Amino acid sequence: MAKTYRVGIIGCGGMGHSHSRAYTKNPATELVAAMDINEGSVKTLAEEFSIPAVYTDYRQMLEKEELDIVSITTWQGVRAEITVAAANAGVKGILGEKPMSASLGEADDMIEACEKKGAKLVIGHNGRFSATSTEIRRLVADGAIGQPTLVHHRAKPNAGLLNTGTHAIDGWRYILSDPETLWVIGQTSRTTDRWERRTM
């Protein structure tokens, strides 16, 4: 008989619901625990998806539950500490939302902890799997549109590099098969949210 993977959701907002829906459609996964600092949010998610155990502290959840997988769908400011704690607790599959963390140093800490404990860390850059991205990648690989030499991406107003810019960077890296970067130029303005400016 195939293994059923025990899943915990950390962060019960919109993306927590999205991840929960996906897990309920996969016969190899079982939602066993959910955590959010907002008690109302975690109870709502647990009721909607029949999740038996609810927590308002991720440390307690990681200590009490034997989880195979966690989805971390919190605000990016706490993803690094939760990822490191999950790896240290023995969780072998960690799915995080984008952006991965609030800084490069935190991202390095996450990777190091997961490598040390043998955990697989995946960041949910779902934009690369769109039909448009897949077709553009095929056209580039086939040489149908020539060899791209420049990528210009304009973000939506107030979208921010940290919030949605990671989709653009990941998408172009995917489409262009991770080419060697020769040089980069960028422009920023002071119209982004304060928390986003602090991370640059």
Model-derived features with residue positions:
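Rossmann-like dinucleotide-binding domain that binds NAD(P)(H)
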Residues: 152-200
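Beta-strand-loop-alpha-helix segment that lines the small-molecule cofactor/substrate pocket
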Residues: 64, 68-69, 75-76, 80-128, ...
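Short, Asp-centered acidic motifs that coordinate Mg2+ and/or phosphate
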Residues: 33, 53, 69, 93, ...
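Glycine-centered tight turns that cap/initiate beta-strands
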Residues: 28, 66, 144-147, 180
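Rossmann-like NAD(P)H-binding beta-loop-alpha module
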Residues: 131-151
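Structural detector of well-ordered beta-strand residues that form the stable sheet scaffold
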Residues: 55, 94-95, 122, 151-152, ...
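N-terminal Rossmann-like dinucleotide-binding module
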Residues: 1-49, 172
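Conserved SAM-binding strand-loop segment of SAM-dependent methyltransferases
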Residues: 51-58
